[in-house]
């Protein structure tokens, strides 16, 4: 009988690139090794009562994927069952020293220190961090790490942190009012950076000359968008794969209660692409949650390697007719229209014009070469 490894996921992160990448990696590694990977959602208040009596194994590894402070605080309740081997994927926990909880995380500190040093040497002195969620353990840890690095360079300032206390739109609006005070901004993910950069250009801010945007790691997406960001290359799929491998190792060695694994974090350097405010009018300067959701969907296409959908999206933005797109991609009309319906649904678009409005100002013409 195949070993069954549960993956317990926190609700509410369906569109988060890091979240989907970890689960995709764990599922792919499970298929490769002939293991059953069973994903289920579990809210924070359900964790203490979670049972795995249906798994017929003396040692039962469990992969946990979540981010909120409340959810992670309740993870330690699973340690009451001595047969369980909880593995926290994508986050580290100081409490892991006191509870048998394994962690598979990314060591960002060295990469942040190195990049900040390079930007400092190039004359950058005014840094901001934008987009942190106040109830996210990951963002709290990242905020503390970023503050520590800035203090080491003598650049720390209390007002340089723009959190999503009142939502992303309000967060970006507040930063937009202060943007001229900064020459470098670290965004908590690349998608927020991509949403803000063209609006900064519309305000007359030259990117990257006046403002260097840095994102926290959706590498394939960043290389295909305008601007091509400096980004921390966090391989979320690899975190998922490593978590599954860790689960198998713990099941084979019952004497080992937990372990801590840190993956390396690299720096992806985008080219100095000058972007313009073309296509923006006064009404479109407002931040649109649909736009953020559309970029998350494109990120999922990249993560899944869905080259066909990306090529269709490229054709739509090139203003090709449906017949021309079908001919280019060797698709029947019915197959193309089926794909387009799925793309519109994923983007949250109601029409072709709406899809272009949501994505056209970001996608470069070379995205088909990146899959």
What is the meaning of each model-derived region?
Residues 33, 100-101, 176-187, 191-278:
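Flexible loop/turn connectors
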Residues 113-153, 259-275:
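An alpha-beta-alpha
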Residues 93, 102-130, 167-173, 193, ...:
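Hydrophobic alpha-helical segments within soluble ligand-binding/sensing domains
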Residues 29-44, 129, 147-169:
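Short beta-strand elements in bilobed, periplasmic/extracellular small-molecule ligand-binding domains
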Residues 292-335, 361-364:
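Helix-turn-helix DNA-binding segment
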Residues 245-304, 323, 365-371:
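Linker/hinge segments immediately adjacent to helix-turn-helix/homeobox DNA-binding domains
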Residues 341-371:
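Basic, Lys/Arg-enriched C-terminal extension of HTH/homeodomain DNA-binding domains
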């Amino acid at each position: 009988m195949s070993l069954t490894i549960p993956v317990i996921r926190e609700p509410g992160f369906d569109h988060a690139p890091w979240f989907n990448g970890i689960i995709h990696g764990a599922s792919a590694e499970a298929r490769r090794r002939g293991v059953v990977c069973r994903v289920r959602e579990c809210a924070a208040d359900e964790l203490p009562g979670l049972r795995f009596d249906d798994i017929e194994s003396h040692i039962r590894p469990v992969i946990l994927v979540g981010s909120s402070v409340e959810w992670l605080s309740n993870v330690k309740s699973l340690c009451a069952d001595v047969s369980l081997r909880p593995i926290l994927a994508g986050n580290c926990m100081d409490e892991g020293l006191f509870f048998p909880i394994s962690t598979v995380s990314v060591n960002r500190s060295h990469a942040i220190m190195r990049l900040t040093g390079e930007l400092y040497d190039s004359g950058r002195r005014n840094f901001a961090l934008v987009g942190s969620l106040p109830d996210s353990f990951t963002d709290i840890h990242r905020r503390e790490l970023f503050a520590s690095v800035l203090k080491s360079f003598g650049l720390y300032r209390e007002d340089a942190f723009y959190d999503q206390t009142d939502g992303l739109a309000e967060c970006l609006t507040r930063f937009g009012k202060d943007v001229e005070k900064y020459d470098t901004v670290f965004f908590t993910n690349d998608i927020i950076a991509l949403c803000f950069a063209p609006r900064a250009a519309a305000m007359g801010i030259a990117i990257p000359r006046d403002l260097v945007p840095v994102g926290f790691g959706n590498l394939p997406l960043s290389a295909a968008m305008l601007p091509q960001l400096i980004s921390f290359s966090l391989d979320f799929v690899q975190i998922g794969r490593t978590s599954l491998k860790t689960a198998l190792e713990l099941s084979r060695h019952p004497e080992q209660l937990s372990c801590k694994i840190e993956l390396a974090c690299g720096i992806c350097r985008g080219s100095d692409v000058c972007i313009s405010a073309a296509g923006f009018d006064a009404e479109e300067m407002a931040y649109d949650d649909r736009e953020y959701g559309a970029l998350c969907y494109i990120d999922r296409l990249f993560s899944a390697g869905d080259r066909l959908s990306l090529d269709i999206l490229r054709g739509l933005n090139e203003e090709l007719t449906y017949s021309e797109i079908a001919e280019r991609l060797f698709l029947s009309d019915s197959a193309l229209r089926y794909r387009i319906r799925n793309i519109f649904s994923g983007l949250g678009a109601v029409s072709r014009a709406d899809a272009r409005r949501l994505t056209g100002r970001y996608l470069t013409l070379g995205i088909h070469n990146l899959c």
